[in-house]
Amino acid sequence: MHEASYALTIVDTVMEALKKEGLENVKVTKVIIKIGELSLVDPVALRNAFEAYSLGSPLEGAELEIEVVPSKFVCKRCGHEWTFKDVYPELKANIPVIHLYPHLVKDLLKCPKCNSSEVEIVQGTEFVIEGFEYQESNE
């Protein structure tokens, strides 16, 4: 379950940012992240892990806003573009592997138009903390 490692990274990164900016008496109310579709992150599991890892910190009780970035592939040979959803039936058996190693999806894909294996992942592997919102703490 790599959702736990994502959650820990989110908490650690925001805590570092708070310390760096001298924001010691604040309560984080929202954390905004973008996660690529190819990571196959379960938003419920991620939120649960975030909730657990943020206990006792300024992030406790913060909303975790998750934007899932859709995948996009392009064939280097013919230029055709497509998404993960377009080829999901062919990749269904490999979902557990893709879940753990999203970068391997490139090795499992062929262009649906020309059948070339020269495929580039344009988007869908992101993990970005876009920002966070906070308010002054009463404590």
Swiss-Prot record:
InterPro entries, per the entry: Hydgase_Ni_incorp_HypA/HybF_CS (IPR020538), HypA/HybF (IPR000688)
UniProt-annotated binding residues for Ni(2+): H2
GTP-binding recorded as keyword: no
Domain of life where this protein originates: Archaea
Residues that coordinate or bind Zn(2+): C75, C78, C111, C114
GO terms assigned for molecular function: nickel cation binding; zinc ion binding
PROSITE patterns: HYPA
Gene Ontology biological process terms in this record: protein maturation; protein modification process
Pfam families from the UniProt entry: HypA (PF01155)
Keywords carried by this UniProt record: Metal-binding, Nickel, Zinc
Listed PANTHER family: HYDROGENASE MATURATION FACTOR HYPA
Function comment: Involved in the maturation of [NiFe] hydrogenases. Required for nickel insertion into the metal center of the hydrogenase.
Family: Belongs to the HypA/HybF family.
Record-given protein name: Hydrogenase maturation factor HypA
Organism encoding this protein: Ignicoccus hospitalis (strain KIN4/I / DSM 18386 / JCM 14125)
Gene that specifies this protein: hypA
